[in-house]
Regions:
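Internal alpha-helical scaffold of NAD(P)-dependent oxidoreductase catalytic cores
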Residues: 100-110, 125-159
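Rossmann-like NAD(P)(H) cofactor-binding subdomain of soluble oxidoreductases
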Residues: 38, 46, 54-129
């Protein structure tokens, strides 16, 4: 499994640290240089981590792409990226709904929203996901508990409560 992370802020860094401590069978973790401090720190933790300056390089080398960008930056960045049909996109961006993400990440069809918390680094994060996806749920279960929202409206309410 090759994971890609666009954006390396607090949440993304916590998720990666948690996954590295877990028993996840990850072949490679491709990350962006967006936060130079965090990306360098992560690279030192594992030889599985590769740092790229271009988001497209991360997308081209990953089967599951996690989007951990600020809302204002996410739309702009995703518009210029080219995704593949079989890729799974997991968005940590609160303001982008599934419909918008499907448009921005086309032709990728599998889009999941996820709201992990910084405790993911210690495998203590309650993570909200929508819609349910077996593989993504199992990844987040490695870094804490998972709550699957019934629909996007419930997902949005749960996100507000977790922030």
């Amino acid at each position: 499994m090759k994971l890609g992370f666009i954006g390396t802020g607090t949440i993304t860094t916590s998720v990666i640290e948690g996954l590295l401590k877990s028993k996840a069978k990850i072949g490679q973790i491709n990350i962006s240089k967006r936060s130079k401090k965090n990306s360098l720190k992560l690279r030192k933790k594992s030889k599985k981590i590769k740092v790229y300056s271009k988001n497209q390089d991360i997308i081209d080398k990953s089967s599951i792409i996690f989007v951990g960008l600020l809302p204002k930056v996410a739309t702009k960045e995703l518009k210029i990226c080219k995704f593949k049909k079989g890729q799974i996109i997991v968005s940590f961006v609160s303001t982008l709904n599934i419909k918008n993400l499907k448009t921005l990440c086309n032709p990728a069809k599998v889009i999941i929203k996820a709201a992990p918390l910084p405790m993911a680094s210690d495998s203590l994060s309650p993570t909200i996901i929508f819609p349910n996806h077996r593989l993504i749920k199992s990844l987040f279960e490695l870094i804490g508990s998972v709550v699957v929202a019934k629909n996007e409206k419930q997902n949005n309410h749960l996100w507000v409560m977790s922030s």
